């Protein structure tokens, strides 16, 4: 699946997603020097991602443009997962 990169979460159309969330990863395998926000529908990743240099950039953008709440990663989650915005 070809990723659709957005510069801001405000570019994402959540209207067609029943239970959307944003999973934030720190230095995942496919972007080892970046932070990545991946848009999900329930347990399925969509093709949309936001890539930034710092975690703070991602957090500020999501806080500014959504009403989502942050949930930190659990012990069973992949190590690169920072947490999920729902």
Q: Where on the chain are the PLM-derived regions?
A:
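Short N-terminal "domain-start" leader segments
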Residues: 2-34, 65, 71-73
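Short, mixed-charge low-complexity intrinsically disordered segments
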Residues: 68-86
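Local beta-strand/beta-hairpin segments that build beta-sheet-rich folds
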Residues: 4, 16, 44-53
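A short, structured beta-strand/loop element
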Residues: 31-47
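A short, charged, amphipathic alpha-helix used as a generic interaction element across diverse proteins
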Residues: 49-71
């Amino acid at each position: 699946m070809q990723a659709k990169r957005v510069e801001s979460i405000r570019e994402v159309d959540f209207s067609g997603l029943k239970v959307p969330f944003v999973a934030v990863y720190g230095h995942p395998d496919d972007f080892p020097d970046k932070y990545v926000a991946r848009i999900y529908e329930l347990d399925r990743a969509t093709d949309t991602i936001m890539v930034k240099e710092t975690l703070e950039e991602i957090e500020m953008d999501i806080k500014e443009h959504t009403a989502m709440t942050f949930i930190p990663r659990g012990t069973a989650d992949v190590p690169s997962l920072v947490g999920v915005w729902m």
